[in-house]
C-alpha cells in the first residue's frame, strides 16, 4: 500500500512538472497598450529558446518571419482595435490569447480568439525573428498574409485567403492560400504552390516547381528541375527552366523562352509561343496561334489559328512531328542538318497553295480549278528520318530554310 502511494505521489509530481517545463521554456511576455491614431494598439513581446523547428498557428492576422544571426527566437505581436474607449479596447485585447512555448525540438507561437465572434475592427500581426539555421518553419493563419525569408531550412505556409511571400529559403517550400497571390524569390529546393485564384510569381527555384491557381497568371523566371503549371484561365510565362515543363490554362496565353527539356503546353483558346526547347514539344490550343522555334520535333494542334515551327538539332530526342490546324496557315522552318521525311496536305486547295524551298519536297494536286481540289507534298531531306506530317483543312503550307 505504501509503495502504491509512492507511485501515485510521483505521478502527481510529474503531472505538475510537465506544464511547468513547457512554460519555463520561454520567457515571460511583456504587454503594452497605447493609442495609435484613431485606434488602440497592444504590443506583446517575448522570446523562446533556439530549437530546430518553429510553428506559428493563428486564427487571424498576418505572420512575418525573418531569419537572422541572433541565438534565440524573438516575437512581437501587434493587435489593433478600432475607435473605442481604453476600457473597451483592453477588454477586447484580453479575449485574444497569445501563448508561446517550446515542446521537444519545436517552438510554438499560438494566437487564439476566445471571445466568441471577433469584432471586425480587431486585427493583428505576428512578427518573429529566428536563427537562420532553423530546419522547419510551419506557418498558418486563417486569413492574413504570410511573409518568410532568410532561413536555411524548409518553409510550409498556409492562409485562408491572404497573400504569400517567400524569399531566401535554403530548403523547399509549400505555400497554399485560398485566394491571394504567391510571390517567391529564391528557394533552394522544390516548390509546391497553390492559390484559389491569385497570381503566382517565382524568380528562382533549385528544385521542381508545381504551381496551381484557380484563375490567376503564373510567371517563372528560372527553374532548375522542371515545372508543372496549371491555371483556370490566366496567362503563363516561363523564361528559363531545365527539365520537363507541363503547362495547362483554361484560356490564357502561354509564353515560354528557354526550356532545357521536353514541354507539354495546352490552352483552351490562347496563343502559344516558345523560343526554344531541347526536347519534344506538344502544343495544343482551342483556337489561338502556335509558334514553336528551336525544337527537335513537335506536335502542334489548333482549332483555327496559324502554326509556325522551326525544326533544329538540339541534341535532344527527336520524334515524329504532327502539325495540324482547322483553318490557318502552317509554316515550317527546317535547319540545314535536320534529316526528316515530309508529308503535307491541304483539304480545300482552291485558293491555297503549298510552297517549298527544298527541291526534294515534291508538291502535287488533285481535282481541277472548277471543282474541289486537294494539295499534297512529300519528300526526304538529308536522307530522311522522323516523319513530319503537316495538315490544314483550309490554308497555305510553307516549307522554308532556317537561316540559323
Enumerate the language-model features and the residues they cover.
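Intrinsically disordered, low-complexity terminal regions
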Residues: 1-404
Amino acid at each position: 500500500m505504501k509503495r502504491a502511494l509512492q507511485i501515485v505521489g510521483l505521478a502527481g509530481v510529474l503531472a505538475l512538472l510537465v506544464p511547468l517545463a513547457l512554460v519555463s521554456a520561454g520567457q515571460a511576455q511583456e504587454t503594452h497598450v497605447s493609442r495609435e491614431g484613431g485606434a488602440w494598439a497592444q504590443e506583446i513581446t517575448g522570446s523562446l529558446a533556439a530549437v530546430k523547428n518553429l510553428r506559428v498557428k493563428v486564427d487571424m492576422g498576418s505572420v512575418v518571419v525573418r531569419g537572422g544571426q541572433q541565438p534565440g527566437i524573438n516575437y512581437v505581436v501587434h493587435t489593433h482595435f478600432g475607435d473605442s474607449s481604453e476600457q473597451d479596447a483592453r477588454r477586447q485585447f484580453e479575449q485574444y490569447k497569445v501563448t508561446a512555448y517550446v515542446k521537444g525540438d519545436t517552438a510554438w507561437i499560438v494566437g487564439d480568439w476566445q471571445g466568441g465572434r471577433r469584432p471586425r475592427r480587431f486585427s493583428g500581426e505576428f512578427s518573429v525573428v529566428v536563427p537562420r539555421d532553423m530546419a522547419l518553419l510551419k506557418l498558418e493563419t486563417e486569413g492574413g498574409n504570410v511573409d518568410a525569408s532568410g532561413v536555411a531550412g524548409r518553409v510550409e505556409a498556409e492562409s485562408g485567403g491572404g497573400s504569400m511571400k517567400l524569399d531566401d529559403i535554403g530548403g523547399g517550400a509549400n505555400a497554399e492560400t485560398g485566394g491571394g497571390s504567391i510571390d517567391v524569390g529564391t528557394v533552394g529546393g522544390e516548390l509546391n504552390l497553390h492559390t484559389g485564384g491569385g497570381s503566382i510569381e517565382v524568380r528562382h527555384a533549385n528544385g521542381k516547381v508545381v504551381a496551381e491557381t484557380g484563375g490567376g497568371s503564373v510567371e517563372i523566371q528560372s527553374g532548375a528541375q522542371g515545372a508543372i503549371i496549371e491555371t483556370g484561365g490566366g496567362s503563363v510565362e516561363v523564361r528559363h527552366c531545365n527539365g520537363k515543363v507541363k503547362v495547362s490554362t483554361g484560356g490564357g496565353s502561354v509564353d515560354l523562352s528557354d526550356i532545357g527539356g521536353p514541354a507539354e503546353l495546352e490552352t483552351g483558346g490562347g496563343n502559344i509561343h516558345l523560343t526554344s526547347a531541347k526536347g519534344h514539344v506538344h502544343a495544343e490550343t482551342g483556337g489561338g496561334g502556335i509558334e514553336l522555334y528551336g525544337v527537335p520535333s513537335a506536335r502542334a494542334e489548333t482549332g483555327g489559328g496559324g502554326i509556325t515551327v522551326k525544326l533544329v538539332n538540339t541534341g535532344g530526342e527527336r520524334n515524329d512531328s504532327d502539325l495540324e490546324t482547322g483553318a490557318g496557315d502552317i509554316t515550317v522552318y527546317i535547319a540545314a542538318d535536320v534529316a526528316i521525311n515530309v508529308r503535307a496536305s491541304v483539304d480545300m486547295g482552291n485558293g491555297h497553295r503549298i510552297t517549298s524551298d527544298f527541291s526534294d519536297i515534291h508538291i502535287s494536286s488533285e481535282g481541277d480549278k472548277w471543282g474541289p481540289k486537294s494539295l499534297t507534298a512529300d519528300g526526304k531531306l538529308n536522307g530522311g528520318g522522323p516523319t513530319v506530317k503537316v495538315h490544314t483543312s483550309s490554308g497555305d503550307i510553307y516549307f522554308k530554310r532556317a537561316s540559323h
